[in-house]
Design a protein with these regions (language model features):
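Extracytoplasmic gate region of multi-pass secondary transporters
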Residues: 18-22, 141, 214-257, 267
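Conserved MFS/SLC helix-loop-helix module at the cytosolic interface between two early adjacent transmembrane helices
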Residues: 49-87
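C-terminal ends and interior cores of transmembrane alpha-helices
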Residues: 72-86, 288-303
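Cytoplasmic membrane-interface "Motif A"-like loop-to-helix N-cap segments
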Residues: 60-71, 275-288
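Glycine-rich segments within core transmembrane alpha-helices of 12-TM secondary carriers
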Residues: 126-149
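Flexible cytoplasmic inter-helical loops of multi-pass small-molecule transporters
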Residues: 185-206
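Helix-to-loop junctions at the C-terminal end of transmembrane segments
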Residues: 50-62, 266-279
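Intracellular juxtamembrane helix-capping segments at the cytosolic ends
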Residues: 104-118, 304
């Protein structure tokens, strides 16, 4: 599980670098906020198209191959981005990231975790996975911010040079950990060969039809969708703080990285709550409390 956590945790910091360095990205790549949003929209579309086949792919190929491909692919795409290419090439990079962090990663990551976890501890293991990923991402983001601040303030390379150093750091970490994960997972029981009695393409379509007609899956999808809408709002926090409140790039990064350190705690708590409490009522309370109007109303009543 630790290898899965570290492996997946090295991928997302550079893919979602916007949450800490939005203003610096706009300046370095000479693009507008709308163009950066277009890149992330492309990323979301690729995710939509690849999440479903990623599950099928994880049944056909070993986890270590898929995750290693994801890490090395993400790393080299990051090195390409560090050259500050034209906007058209940046969009190609985000398409590539959609493949390396969606198609080849997600299904393998979920399958690997579910195989490791005992039946009565699934929630706990997935909570540890999310918490561990959050810890790795927060740690890498903190180091990335330190690298950015060092090159900006001590070396004096300017915003573009400092962000380039951060991108190189993220890319090399993902590439460097690839052989460790690849060889360490070689003896894992997750690498069992595919079942020779598994059904072919006709069975795949029957399974897909069964999934699409399951109401619980659609309800779970709606819950995830709502949760991600709240999650995506936080991605614009860096740009808001820098453009509206006129905070420096380093100060903004410190605030957004501090938010990332809350994720490990939340992941662990969510996993244990999933094992010991009723999940649906608890999700309802969380979604309601996350609504900004609910928070403002509560604050208003409290002040009265």
């Amino acid at each position: 599980l630790l290898l899965l956590i570290i492996g997946s945790g090295t991928i997302y910091p550079v893919v979602y670098m916007r949450q800490n360095f939005e203003g610096s990205m706009l300046e370095t790549f000479d693009i507008t906020r709308a163009q950066l949003g277009e890149c992330h929209s492309i990323l979301g579309i690729v995710f939509f198209l690849t999440y479903l086949p990623s599950g099928w792919l994880s049944d056909k190929l070993p986890t270590r191959w898929l995750m290693s491909l994801s890490m090395v692919g993400t790393g080299f795409l990051a090195l390409w981005l560090s050259t500050a290419p034209e906007f058209a090439q940046i969009k190609l990079i985000f398409i590539g990231w959609g493949i390396t962090s969606g198609l080849t990663l997600w299904g393998a990551l979920i399958k690997g975790t579910s195989l490791l976890a005992p039946h009565d501890q699934q929630g706990r293991f997935f909570g540890l996975l999310e918490s561990g990923r959050g810890l790795v991402e927060a740690l890498l983001a903190s180091i990335g911010l330190a690298v950015f601040a060092y090159f900006l303030n001590s070396v004096g390379t300017g915003t573009s040079g400092s962000l380039t150093a951060v991108i190189w750091f993220y890319g090399l970490v993902a590439i460097g950990f690839t052989p460790i994960l690849f060889f360490a997972l070689r003896t894992s029981h997750m690498e069992a060969p595919p079942d020779p009695n598994s059904r072919g393409i006709s069975g795949l379509f029957r399974d897909l039809k069964q999934l699409l007609t399951n109401q619980k899956i659609w309800l779970a999808a709606i819950v995830i969708l709502v949760g991600y809408q709240i999650f995506w709002v936080t991605y614009s926090l860096a740009g808001l703080l820098q453009s509206i409140f006129q905070l420096s790039a380093v100060t903004v990064g410190a605030i957004t990285v501090g938010r990332l350190w809350m994720r490990p705690l939340g992941g662990v708590l969510a996993g244990f709550i999933g094992d010991y409490f009723r999940v649906i009522p608890f999700l309802g309370v969380l979604m309601l409390s996350a609504h900004p109007r609910f928070d403002m109303d509560a604050a208003g009543h409290g002040s009265e």
